[in-house]
């Protein structure tokens, strides 16, 4: 059961035992759609398949968002500057996939960033995405320098869509190198799009762009019908599965 009368501005209150979401098109002008529920794997998969994602602070209830416009990126259109290409070609960094998910998400939560006070990746979020990784739906890319983890990213994969969640670096360009490695993997495996979610200057420089939410939802509806690459992407054990969204 979904209830909207308890909250202002038509923000929906999610029931604990029902995983349905209201249409993403019903979100407020700033993108907030619903409040409550939980971070169970079932609810998260339904959310991402519906163009919705959780984003909240430790001292807040779970908040669910669907932004308009939506930032996306095609893996084939990643922009690599000459200096970054030189860094990649130098092989001073090495990359892997799904070899250290727990550490990547913990670093994303803990590494300080400019113009950001605290983190939205709270302990419950960390636990939830670790479980999604165990189930084969959440994935990480790791960047190493002299065997030290210095950058990385993580996100959720459904159909031919990769939903990027967060990235970090402790050494210049390490997260960009991770993004390049991700795009190479996605291209090889015929992924169509990366859901960047929020419009940021950093990702615009990397080749991302915004589209109206209604257009994003149309693309998403098509792309999630494709088989999902479920499992560990790094050890060759992942298999293509048709994920049925109930």
Feature map (PLM): residue ranges:
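N-acyltransferase acceptor-side catalytic subdomain
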Residues: 1-246
């Amino acid at each position: 059961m979904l209830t909207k009368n308890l909250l202002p501005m038509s923000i929906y209150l999610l029931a604990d035992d029902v995983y349905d979401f209201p249409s993403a098109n019903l979100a407020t002008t700033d993108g907030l759609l619903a409040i409550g529920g939980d971070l169970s794997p079932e609810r998260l998969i339904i959310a991402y398949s519906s163009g919705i994602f959780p984003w909240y602070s430790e001292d807040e209830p779970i908040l669910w968002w669907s932004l308009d416009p939506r930032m996306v990126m095609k893996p084939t259109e990643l922009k690599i500057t000459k200096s970054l290409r030189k860094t990649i070609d130098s092989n001073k960094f090495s990359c892997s996939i799904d070899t250290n998910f727990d550490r990547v998400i913990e670093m994303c939560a803990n590494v300080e960033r400019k113009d950001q006070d605290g983190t939205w990746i709270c302990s419950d979020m960390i636990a939830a995405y670790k479980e999604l990784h165990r189930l084969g739906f959440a994935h990480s890319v790791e960047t190493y320098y002299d065997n030290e983890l210095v950058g990385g990213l993580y996100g959720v994969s459904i159909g031919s869509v990769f939903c990027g969640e967060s990235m970090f670096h402790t050494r210049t360009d390490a997260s960009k190198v991770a993004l390049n490695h991700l795009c190479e993997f996605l291209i090889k495996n015929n992924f169509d799009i990366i859901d960047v979610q929020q419009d940021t200057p950093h990702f615009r420089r990397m080749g991302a762009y915004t589209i109206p939410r209604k257009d994003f939802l149309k693309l998403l509806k098509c792309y999630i019908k494709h088989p999902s690459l479920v499992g560990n992407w790094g050890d060759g054990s992942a298999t293509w599965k048709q994920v049925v969204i109930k």
